[in-house]
Amino acid sequence: LAVRRTLETVYENYRGDRSAAEWKALEKYLKKVWFANGIHHHYSNDKFVPGFTEGYLLDVIETIPEEKFGDLNPLRGEVCKAIFDPALYPTKLNQKAGDDLLLTSSSNYYHNVSQAEAEAFYADMAAADAGNPEPVSYGLNSQLTKDDAGRICERVWKLGGMYSPAIERIVYWLEKAQAVAKEPQKTNIAALVSYYKTGDLKEFDRYNIGWVKDTVSNVDFVNGFIEDYGDPLGRKASWEANVNFMDTEACHRTEVISDNAQWFEDHSPVAEAYRKPVVRGVSAKVITVAMLGGDCYPATPIGINLPNADWIRKEYGSKSVTIDNITYAYDMAAHGNGFNEE
């Protein structure tokens, strides 16, 4: 965030030559940061290489009044190191065998904790809940760190916990929606609000069960710490949200397929041992997304297949959703031969 805010302040306040090659390179770098939500590529996870020098950035900053940067001023050295030091934060997500995946990755999900310590911490947590047919997704909504005594602990993302100011705004708008929602969404939103207030993952499961069972609401949404792609251990999730409405005509076509899900399962080209004898709760629809936020923006998925908890999928099914307007936009963007019009 310090990198982004510093570059945004420069972008908004620089009054020098904006036609210079280094300025164009700085502008391009900032756009990459915007698109990837950070200094690493959103797919390859490699760190961006700036096409401008540290000296140029500092010279540009010197032309802008200090008060424009506010609390960013003391962080200038750290910002420059983050951008220009290739050995610092070289990759967002390292999955190389033999490396400590946490100490060599650049996410904020773990702080001062090794891979072995994290794996042992969650193994103990799972062992204490062994035999539970409905286990929560341990660690999904927290940062793993150490307290002042050196003991490993979780900083839970909830009201009054880590990221509380942002979560307060999420809760505020969810409660606004709850006040005008109809059932079953009113009850589902209440469970989600309870989850954000308490950090209790059982409440998140309750919300997910209600959400996947709701196949009648024309307007639907996804909201929460959902996907764990950014965690090298595949445990902690990034926040995302969208609001969408059904494409009725396209939904009819997908319903024909989902209504015959058992036939497709019975005739799938896999060994019989891997086929489900009874397919449960397959809900497929086509939606138009009206709002995107968090980790699903601006690099947007073309579909949704949730929830992720295996036991919920087994007992209650899942929602498989195609996002029609995003699919269309990607298709239109792919047209052409790759050359500029000129």
How would you describe each model-predicted region?
Residues Y11, R15-E341:
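Contiguous, non-catalytic segments that form substrate-binding/exosite surfaces or channel walls
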